[in-house]
Every structure is written in C-alpha cells, then in structure tokens.
Amino acid sequence: MRVTDFSFELPESLIAHYPMPERSSCRLLSLDGPTGALTHGTFTDLLDKLNPGDLLVFNNTRVIPARLFGRKASGGKIEVLVERMLDDKRILAHIRASKAPKPGAELLLGDDERINATMTARHGALFEVEFNDQRSVLDILNSIGHMPLPPYIDRPDEDADRELYQTVYSEKPGAVAAPTAGLHFDEPLLEKLRAKGVEMAFVTLHVGAGTFQPVRVDTIEDHIMHSEYAEVPQDVVDAVLAAKARGNRVIAVGTTSVRSLESAAQAAKNDLIEPFFDDTQIFIYPGFQYKVVDALVTNFHLPESTLIMLVSAFAGYQHTMNAYKAAVEEKYRFFSYGDAMFITYNPQAINERVGE
C-alpha cells in the first residue's frame, strides 16, 4: 500500500483555526461502514445514534503546556516541545535550534529566560532535559509553557486555548496534543447521554508529538509508528466485556481510544481484552483485524496521515475516501478544531484491496 493512496485535495480555507463557540454545535458526518451511506447533521445527533447500554470509551489525558521558548546559555534561540514527562525533574523533548545542543549544554527557558535546565542526553531525535529548579516539571510547564497547537493551526496559542484545546473530562496530565474527538462533548450532552442509559469508561493515552509527524516512507508497511503510553484499567475491561455480553456496542471517542483498546486486545492472553499499562506502537491500517471497537467518533484527519489509514481500516478504504470527498464538497471544517464523524464498523474492510 502506498502512502499516496491516502491523499486528497483539501482547500486551506477548510482548516479550522478556532473551535465552534459551543463545543457540541459542530457538524457531524455519519458514515455507515457496511454500506458507505452518508448522513449530514450536527454533533448532538449522536444522542439518537446511541442505544441504552452502548459503551462510550473516552481518553481522559490532559494536554500540558508543552512548548517552551528560550535560548542556549552559549547563545542561539531554541524551541522545546515536550514529548513526555519522565519524572518530576526530567522531560524527553524535541528541540529546534540552529545548532543542536550537546550533552551538558545549559538552557535558559521561559519568556524571561529565568528557568535553568540542562540537556543531559540524546536519544535519536529526542533530547533528555533536566530542570534545575525546586518545582516539579508540571508546575514549570504550567508557569512558562505554551499550549502546543498543531502545526496546521497557523497562529500563536492564546490564553483561551488552555481550556478550548482540552476535553471537559480531561484528568491526567501528559499529552502534547488533545484527543480532539472529545472536544465536542460538553456537560449538557454528557448528561443527556447518561440519562439515556449510555455507559461511559475512560482510558488514558498520552498523545505524543509524533502524532503530527508526516509518514516519510512511500510504502505504509515500512512506516515505524511512534510510541505512546496507554492505560486500559480493569474497570474499562469489565465495561467492554459487559457491553459485548449484552449485545451492545463499544464506541471509541477518538483514534487514541481506538489505539488504546485495540492495543489491550492485542496484548490479551486469555480474553478478548485485558488490562494494559504500557507503551504502544500499534499501527492500524487497511488489513487490520479490529477486535473491540464497533463504532467510532472522530475528527477529519490530514491527508496521508496514519489516522486516515486507521479510519480506512475501520470503515473500508473506498467508503472513507468517498466520505472525505463529500466532506470537502460540503465544506466541513477539518482537523483538531474542526467537525466530527460518526462511523460504524465495516466487517468487509479487512478484505478490501487498496489502490487498485
């Protein structure tokens, strides 16, 4: 399969730079996986699409203000993007500089350059940085960090992004990108879903900056997926197995929830799914056998991204590309602050040939 098979034309004007004034007021394109049929509506239509007893699985990671600006003590501006927090004093990060810092290099971070840190080691493309400060990494980031808006949102971050680029149920700090499908859920909608009898469970996957890295190979089978930490606790496993047992659906909110659930299923030894607390490099593309997820709520993804490949594996390649074509024609808003899709699983997708 070629990466270019997942390309599509997207006018710049359809990339959303700000979210809708109300979280749940975005548009919703529903794709019936088995038939490819499309329905246009608004996000609150989700209420009618879910049945009592269906299980919604959310990712409760919280975005950290992961972008830092500063300079090397020896001179030269730097930009630091945290990939993950290693402990209370250390981070693993991407560093942009005219000349990469060497181990032992002193860094002065923050708009006033008051935070002192040392680059202690390099791991491939990533740098290990230790803060020389009494405060924890999280406190430092909350104090001097900027929200790490995706590269295609072509504007500086604003104070409002600290809440807007965060789900209302976010709980565990550690992500450098929001699980964006969840941005559309507000408290009134969650309340209505609960009142209808829809069950809810929460996994954690700390989305890394690798999610924005382009696929740099021609053949997708050659792509090496970035690693992210995921948690699927026992209560989620119990909720999934109970939903399946009573004939209800497991609906993943976002591709990160999909990757968490399917990672836990892949690693399971004795059951459909078992608890999972580990890094995952799961790469889902056409031909992948889904084991857990029956339906998916997700945003519109970048051309040639691993995420449009995941959706194609779920709904079928042709159905997915047709839906994206329709979304462009109907001027849906794309990417993190854009509109959403509701997709049901196509069991025939696994047999489909791509790019022929």
Swiss-Prot record:
Monomer. The keyword Ribosomal protein does not apply. It comes from Escherichia coli O127:H6 (strain E2348/69 / EPEC). It comes from the Bacteria. Its main location: cytoplasm. This is S-adenosylmethionine:tRNA ribosyltransferase-isomerase. Its EC number is 2.4.99.17. It catalyses: 7-aminomethyl-7-carbaguanosine(34) in tRNA + S-adenosyl-L-methionine = epoxyqueuosine(34) in tRNA + adenine + L-methionine + 2 H(+). GO terms for molecular function: S-adenosylmethionine:tRNA ribosyltransferase-isomerase activity. Pathway: tRNA modification; tRNA-queuosine biosynthesis.
